[in-house]
Structures are given as C-alpha cells and as structure tokens.
C-alpha cells in the first residue's frame, strides 16, 4: 500500500472518529445549540461568517448538529473506502474551513478551541487537497474498482486520463 493511501485513510479516520463521537453523544445537538446560542465565539469569527452563523446556523443549530454528525461520518467512510474520493476530499476541505472559521479563523485562541484545534483542521484541509490532486491516493479504493469496470469514469474518479488506443 502506498503512502498516499495511508494519508487518505488517516484523514478518513479523523472524520469518522469525530462523527462517531457526535453520534454516541445523545446530548450533542443540544450542546451544540447551547454553545452557538451563547455566541461568544461567533464574535471572533470573520464578519462575513458571523452573518452566516447568526442568520442561518444559530436559528437551526440542532439541524446543523445533525448535519455535522452525518457529514463527518459520510466523509470518514468515503475516504476510508475510497468511494467518490474526489468529492469527499472537496467536502473535507470545505468542512475543515467552516470549522476553522466558526472557531475564529486564524485569530483562534479566543474561541472554543485550543491552538491544536486550528492545526489539526488546517492539516486535514491541506491533506485533503493533496488527496484530491494525487492519483496515488485513489489506489486500493472502490473508485479504482469502479474505474476498471468503466474506463469513462477513470478521469473523474482517479484523476487519470484514458489511454489513447490506436486502432490497427
């Protein structure tokens, strides 16, 4: 197994772990809603993100908590299995950025998380970009199996062009 497969599985395990923790905590939606409604860390988020948080997320906090559970589980499973890896990698980047912004962005320290929180989420985002751009990350994946069955899917799933075959 190549190193990029391990990177893909590791990033998937980070998301899966977060999703399982949220799933096993029956109080998570209420805790998430309470922390959002307290609003202390929203004020340290970038201004454009504060508007989004106050206008969309806070009024629907329990729904967003459920979406986080499902999203983290889905990203973890997809990356570990290598199923729709490119889409999962994009989702991983987006969710990592949203999490960092919701905690105060690069001015982290006054929000809910420790500096390690910022480091982990930025690292997950960067590794997800590498997964997205690297064909080697799709080895030993369900995407590779699907691409073998349909050559037309290979560029989409594996970031590889179809070989030009000349007819004799």
Regions found by a protein language model. Name each.
Residues 1-74, 81-168:
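Extended, low-polarity transmembrane helix blocks
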């Amino acid at each position: 197994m190549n190193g990029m497969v391990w990177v893909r599985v590791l990033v998937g395990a980070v998301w899966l772990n977060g999703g399982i923790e949220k799933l096993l905590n029956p109080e998570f939606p209420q805790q998430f809603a309470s922390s959002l409604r307290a609003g202390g860390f929203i004020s340290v988020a970038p201004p454009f993100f504060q508007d989004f948080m106050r206008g969309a997320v806070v009024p629907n906090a329990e729904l967003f908590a459920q979406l986080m559970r499902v999203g983290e589980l889905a990203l973890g499973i997809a990356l570990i299995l290598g199923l729709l890896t490119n889409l999962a990698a994009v989702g991983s980047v987006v969710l990592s950025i949203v999490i960092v912004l919701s905690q105060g962005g690069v001015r982290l320290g006054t929000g809910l998380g420790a500096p390690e929180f910022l480091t982990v989420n930025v690292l997950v985002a960067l590794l997800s970009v590498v997964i997205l751009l690297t064909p080697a990350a799709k080895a030993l994946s369900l995407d590779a199996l699907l691409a073998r069955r349909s050559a037309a899917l290979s560029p989409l799933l594996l970031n590889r062009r179809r070989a030009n075959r000349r007819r004799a």
